[in-house]
């Protein structure tokens, strides 16, 4: 019995038709692990940064028709929410588990906060080859950093700084069949390794 990780069948919750039925599937197959991950990693971030972090598991409460295509737990230093702050995420689409750190378009002082990625441009380029960027958290697309030109990356960061709807996340993503999802131990190790790479961008 696993506590934190996800099986390939859990991702099939996103194939369930209809809002109510899909929410039931998410509640059964995915949200329990997200809550456990929320407890574990809010303590992890609090320990690593010296600031108190709070977990926020997606509720999808505003939806009335369209079922969610993704779900997540986010970590930020506010009890009230995470969208207005730089934050960490663990989440899922039907074809991927993703891990991210960055700034959403709704963030307060977004232009100032997003400049961390401008300052640490070289550090982004030096992330391992399987690290990616996400420029729209609502879409599954996450190009590999190694596949972007310097100009592509600079333009993406500038968009997050200067355009109202712009956002920028550094990310990592794995498939539902990935061996790092086979056990809690392997999954937690993967997540901690990823967040260790992200933390210097938070504290910069």
Curated annotation (Swiss-Prot):
| Sequence intervals crossing the membrane | none
InterPro entries in the record, alphabetically?
UPF0637 (IPR009403), UPF0637_domain_sf (IPR053707)
Q: Specify one Pfam family.
A: DUF1054
Q: Which family does it belong to?
A: Belongs to the UPF0637 family.
Protein name according to UniProt: UPF0637 protein SaurJH9_1166
